[in-house]
Amino acid sequence: MRASDAHHHLSSSNIISFEKLELLFKGADTEDARGGSEMVGQRYLDLLAELTAIAEYQWRSGSPRGLVKGFMLSGPPGTGKTTLAKRLAYELGCRFQSDNDPPIALAFIDGGEISRSRYGESEERIRDIFLHARSGFTAQGQRSVLLFDDVESIFMARGSQHAKEWHFSQDSVFFHSIDELDTSRSTIVLTSNRPDLIDEAIRDRFLSYVVDYPDLETLIQMIEQIPALVQLSGAQRATMKNDLVAAVKDGTVRSMRDAQRFAMRHFVSKILKKDSLAQHVVD
């Protein structure tokens, strides 16, 4: 089956073009990048550099059966795992720009993209995704990053008390597809909040990294890079920073997502000129 014949099996909204990645990350180390504020802190930059170096080496090697099939990023919610995977795709896209090759694509796959009620359809969707990876998602010969987000909802451990018969079948198709992946053209990234729920045979096929809660300095740096908050006065920014330090110490703010919500409430309070009635939500 050609990729074009199977294209209807994968929603176009799940294919993120290099052009869209550029909108998020071009100039990501400056304040004008919409996605850059989530990629701060030396730990995140070190992770990005390592993932990029490994994937780039395998893509340039030309060997379709590289030793590293991809990466598994695990950690608490809101710590930037998905953003890190998208940034990896952008960095690879920058390194493999060529007049002779189409721009790379990022395929975003979650449980909703895979799960289907009819027996065998979910397995067929997994096969279709890897078929696209071999031939190109939107153009022949296109390189790609396959991002399986919250992968524990798709490929559950066979020994789990929550696993169903169809989980075994999906896992089996995924095992085979991973082993057949052309690592000179595609890289897989899995993200998970609960790696203990993922089948061990899947975990063993990937390099595993922990993306943990950022430190206080990183959270402050992230807040300071949000463009909308530049409008705050020096006194307001100092107050926000002091409040953030207190929120981190009492555990109210832990993740990047928490910090973004914290900044949003401060911004709203500036508009209202009083404290917002919005409730704080902890992941």
Tell me what each language-model feature is:
Residues 1-4, 232-283:
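Conserved AAA+ ATPase small/helical "lid" subdomain
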Residues 17-70:
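Pre-Walker A (pre-P-loop) alpha-helix and adjacent loop at the N terminus of AAA/AAA+ ATPase modules
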Residues 67-107, 132-136:
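Walker A/P-loop
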Residues 105-139:
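Short glycine-rich substrate-engagement loop in P-loop NTPases that contacts/grips substrate
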Residues 122-129, 159-183, 212-214:
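Substrate-gripping "pore-loop 1 plus following alpha2 helix"
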Residues 147, 172-176, 186-193:
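Structural recognition of the conserved hydrophobic beta-strand(s) that form the central parallel beta-sheet
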Residues 194-207:
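Short regulatory helix/loop adjacent to the ATP-binding pocket of P-loop NTPases
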Residues 207-225:
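Conserved AAA+ ATPase "SRH/arginine-finger" region at the nucleotide-binding site
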